[in-house]
């Protein structure tokens, strides 16, 4: 792998505890972590977790609701990667058109990265579909990920609903 092509910065997120969302559902809470360190050696920078702003952008917040600076997040948690779109498609779900884009993310090998993790890239959240150790040499990971649909206040109010 030509590591000089890894020009993007991504943050891996792991599920930790569970929390209740605005609709009363129990959902996992995702926290940033350093994939190059064993979990027992990681020191948390405050209690930071993944949330979304009113426009549906993925953001990191402290437990008290204060924003965690994006530059600090990149400094503390990011790793080099190459993020490139693979395919896009639209489909109809519940009388709405949904767009889905799949991305290929290349990065150095990190032990323990799997489909339960998420990726944060430029305020966008990605669900990991598959993780491949290319060549089986523990040098490079190829991750296939799908961008999560943004959850906005308009989506939650159901303004697109005809009924």
Language-model-derived ranges and their functions:
Residues 10-12:
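A short beta-strand micro-motif
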Residues 3-5, 14-19, 25-163:
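Short, conserved turn/kink motifs that form compact alpha/beta structural patches or helix kinks used as
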């Amino acid at each position: 792998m030509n590591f000089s092509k890894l020009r993007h910065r991504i943050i891996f997120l792991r599920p930790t505890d569970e929390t209740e969302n605005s609709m009363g559902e129990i959902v996992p809470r995702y926290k940033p972590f350093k994939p190059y360190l064993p979990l027992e050696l990681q020191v948390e920078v405050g209690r930071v977790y993944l949330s979304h702003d009113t426009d549906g952008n993925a953001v990191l917040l402290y437990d008290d609701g204060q924003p965690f600076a994006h530059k600090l997040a990149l400094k503390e948690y990011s790793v080099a990667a190459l993020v490139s779109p693979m395919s896009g498609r639209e489909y109809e779900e519940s009388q709405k058109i949904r767009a889905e884009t799949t991305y290929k993310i290349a990065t150095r090998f990190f032990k323990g990265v799997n489909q339960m993790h998420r990726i944060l890239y430029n305020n966008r959240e990605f669900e990991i579909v598959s993780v491949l150790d290319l060549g089986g040499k523990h040098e490079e990971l190829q991750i296939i990920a799908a961008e999560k649909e943004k959850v906005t206040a308009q989506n939650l109010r159901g303004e697109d609903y005809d009924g």
